[in-house]
Amino acid sequence: MAQINVIGKNGGRTIDLELPEVNAAILHDVVTWQLASRRRGTASTKTRAQVSKSGKKMYSQKGTGNARHGDRGVPTFVGGGVAFGPKPRSYGYTLPRKVRQLGLAMALADRQDGGKLIAVDGFDLDGKTKSFVSWAAQNGLDGSERVLIVTDDAQTRQSARNVAWATVLPVAGLNAYDILRHDRLVIDAVALEPAQEEVEQ
């Protein structure tokens, strides 16, 4: 059981969150699955049937003294088709739901163990970039680290969206990959409840 400190304008409190021990292999599986799902898979090459070449045999089979060849579209010639080249496809695959949930919980645990998790009881920002920068400075965020902010508050998202070192995600978009690729995690306390439910299922 992890105790997470929550900061707020009316003082602090703690939240008890059941987090597992970090397992690098499971985190690797989840991150690899996420990255595979994000791949566009648009790489495409033309086969010998698709290149703009005549299908006519270059010269007769015998009598020229040259090597025997068919048409000019074969992969052995410059400008010919590609043998076994890539075609558009999906690189995504299925990962068990419990493994995905465990990966998210372990990513949260990793940030909590390293003292890189900040939970907030309402940001109380006015939508201005200046107000976010001021709030961040008061809470030890000076721009030297990349910060992931998870909240559904529209004013907070507007305040932070123009800050180069901050990334804002909605609560529903919380995922292991984005947590791990940022140095710090700043999360709205209300987002920890659905995260706990996700872990416990």
UniProtKB/Swiss-Prot annotation:
Supply the name of the protein.
Large ribosomal subunit protein uL4
Recorded GO MF terms: rRNA binding; structural constituent of ribosome
| Superkingdom as given in the UniProt entry | Bacteria
GO biological process entries: translation
**Which gene name belongs to this protein?**
rplD
Please name the Gene3D superfamilies in this protein's record. Answer: 3.40.1370.10
| Subunit (UniProt) | Part of the 50S ribosomal subunit.
Originating organism: Deinococcus deserti (strain DSM 17065 / CIP 109153 / LMG 22923 / VCD115)
Composition-biased stretches (Polar residues): 42-53
